[in-house]
């Protein structure tokens, strides 16, 4: 499920110490969930050529596209704005997980952070601008 462009899927965002957020009101003009290729893998090979295992390197970056009027978008904006700072660095970032379910298949992204929310092009009225929410995850279960 690298890219979802259907509204038949169910997305749930789990934030540390908070109730789950059921995602609604996707941006109809873009993919609702996409996984970017920030993940690489290397194989461990011994000097005699024996292959042992794959190791995953890097983070998984996922983008969630919501319409501007989405209640989920407002909750994510609140979450992003309330990350605590000490000087220029973040001191508290709540851990997030995202569960994606489509046709009985479930993918779970755990141990991530909400990185940013990027507003889309202005349509003349800011409340209807779509927003792309970017998450970073170390792994997918």
What is each model feature region?
Residues 1-69, 105-134:
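Solvent-exposed edge beta-strands and adjacent loop segments
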Residues 78-108:
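Short, acidic/charged, Gly/Pro-enriched secondary-structure junctions
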Residues 60-86:
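Charged, amphipathic alpha-helical segments
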Residues 138-140:
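Hydrophobic lipid-interacting interfaces of membrane-associated proteins
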